[in-house]
Amino acid sequence: APLKGSLYVIKGVYREMKTAHLREGIMQAVFTACACISILAVVLICVFLFANGLPTIGKIGPLKFLLGTTWKPGNDIYGILPMILGSLYVTAGAIIVGVPVGLLTAIYLSRFSTPAIKRVMLPAVQLLAGIPSVVYGFFGMIVLVPAVQAMVKSDFFKTVLHIKGGKGMSLFTASVLLGIMILPTIITVSKTSLDAVPESYYEGSLALGATHERSVFYAVLPAAKSGVLSAVILGIGRAIGETMAVVMVAGNQTWMPKGLFQGLRTMTSNIVIEMGYAADL
């Protein structure tokens, strides 16, 4: 009887192990399939872009296409250098505006603010992340564009800075608006990275005689630099891929960028505006 009981237990354990192994195999297959689908989607997008784009670029000429400074689809002239530079300038401006503000805000929320302030500011930051791009664009048209237009027309700009002929819809306006739009990403990711730094770093710095501020900026912040860098990269991705808000405030001129307060067009804006020409290529 003890032997039969032992055999029954062994069979039960074997059956459970076999079932668990089967479940594990099924879940592994499901996860592998999901990963393959994600990779396949990226591959198909690349294949579609190259299959439809390379013949057209071959007709135009790679150098004329990439380095051409004139964009006139009606005359079969397709030079995208102004849009490439426009995207780079707007993204750089957004990073200059957004990164310092976002990083300092994250440091404040992580190490300096009171719980009461956190309860107010964190939901506000999350709310900024949920606002649609077109709403940001509308805010830029109604608030930022008139403000910049009045600023460039002021006597200070004309007499002191010697800036004349500026416009409200410009590189500056687009950079400021995009800088505001990337704030939630930079603040959230940077704060998470700062909160993840072991408290021993901060306490050790205090034990060596450093002040609270020096401990935060010279011990905690360097330890979180990889997360902060990730936040900046995500902000760059958000800025360089933004379309609707930039279309509404950048002016959308297809010439080479001429100045901080002059209009320009980005790559994403050009795709939206000139979509009608794509069918005839």
Place the predicted regions along the sequence by residue.
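Hydrophobic positions within alpha-helical transmembrane segments of bacterial inner-membrane proteins
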Residues: L40, S87, T91, I95-L103, ...
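Transmembrane-helix boundary motif in ABC transporter permease subunits
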Residues: T19, A94-V125, P146
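Periplasmic/extracellular loop-to-transmembrane helix junction in inner-membrane transport proteins
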Residues: Y14, K18-G25, A29, A51-A94, ...
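Residue-level signal for discrete positions within transmembrane alpha-helices
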Residues: M83, S87, P123-Q126, G130, ...
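N-terminal signal-anchor/first transmembrane alpha helix
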Residues: H21-V47
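Membrane-interfacial helix termini and adjacent extracytoplasmic/periplasmic loops
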Residues: K59-Y78, F138-I180
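Transmembrane alpha-helices
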Residues: L127, I131, I186-S190, V197, ...
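Interhelical loop and adjacent transmembrane-helix boundary motif
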Residues: V246-L281
